[in-house]
Amino acid sequence: YLHWQGRCKGMTGVARITKLDFFIMKSQGISYLSLVAVILLFGLMGSSITVLCITGAWFIALMATNIFAIQEKNHLDRLYGSVCVSLNEVVLGRYTFVFLNYFTSMVVIIILYLGFVLCRKATFDVPDIMLGLGLSFLVFSTITGIQMPLFFKMGYTKAKLWSVIPFAVVMLLVVLPSFVSALSGILDFAQSHKELFAFACILTSCIIQFVSYHIAVIFYRKQR
């Protein structure tokens, strides 16, 4: 703890919380390697960049929020309380930590994808990559955007069951266009306007994260 505290001098409150989250999750780093294994497997099977990105977003949404479980299991509230930051900075720092997990995973996935493309001497389509990133960010934001306020309000143990709901919601949204013909036009639009659809996904994701953050702050303030 003293080692970590010394390394965080001069940082902003948000950066301190983000750094502390990474410090605590360092022991879980090996579990993230399973994402690389999954992406390699899917890549060898010839999966598209969209499938790879969405798989990564799903995985990170599942793994990154484990910080709440570790904090609760190891009674680390006192450690977080010792950091001189505001409640808003605690929440924003946690959101930043989770987002950086997603961002890093997307960088790794794109590098692996480009590696597959080069090995096969194929060509890659930038709009396809943009569409994959846009959809993956929407999946990630929808899941974590619902989960995070619940964890801040109820704690990991009490919210664990409720945290499954966003995964079910995302699965429903993914399969719904296949069964509802009226929604199939969305898929057609996405394929014919990849850049525009990707931008719409990113914009929607940012709105979800913004609203989620403010709800989480309200919930966390009431808990304190």
Language-model segments: residues:
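Short helix-to-coil transition segments within interhelical loops
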Residues: 82-87
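Hydrophobic alpha-helical transmembrane segments of membrane proteins
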Residues: 1-75, 93-224
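Alpha-helix N-cap/helix-start motif at helix boundaries, enriched for small hydrophobics
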Residues: 89-91
